[in-house]
Amino acid sequence: RLDKDLLARVVGAAQAGEGICVVDCTPETIPDACTHVVIVVAAEVRSAASAAQLLVRLDAARRRCVVVLRQRQWASLSAAEVERIVRSTVLAELPTLRGLTRAVEIGGLPQRLPAPLRKAARAVLEEVGA
């Protein structure tokens, strides 16, 4: 389990350098130092409902958030339906990218990201002003 205090120290050290710091963490361990939170939501009712609750908590804490919709082959919700559930705009959609999960597990992200992933990442970076 990821320790929130340790993560806060790591993020603090990373922010001392130049550039952008990206942290992949659970909702419970989002560091206070994060200026933006990207919530990846599967196109499913349960995931959208959880994201809606998280967005309410983060909004109450005055955290800036964006939503990225993760499509799956068996997903049942459209972007418009997810937007209604989470009461937030879907900034980008990420389709199922065949073979990407396995490639990342074996050797990390490829040098050249697949076009849909590049597009979603670019949208997030533009939104956060990077």
Regions found by a protein language model. Name each.
Residues 7-12, 31, 55, 79-82:
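Short amphipathic alpha-helical segments and helix-helix/interface helices
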Residues 23, 39, 67-69:
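Structural beta-sheet core signal
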Residues 3-7, 30, 46-50, 78, ...:
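Helical mechanochemical/support elements of P-loop NTPase systems and associated helical scaffolds
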Residues 16-18, 25-45:
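Inter-motif core of Ras-like GTPase G domains
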Residues 30-31, 50-68:
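Conserved C-terminal guanine-recognition region of P-loop GTPase G domains, centered on the G4
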Residues 60-130:
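C-terminal lobe/tail of nucleotide-utilizing enzymes
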Residues 41-47, 95-98:
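Short, acidic/turn-prone active-site loops that include or flank metal/cofactor-
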Residues 1-20, 100-106, 110:
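P-loop/Walker-type NTP enzyme "switch/lid" segment
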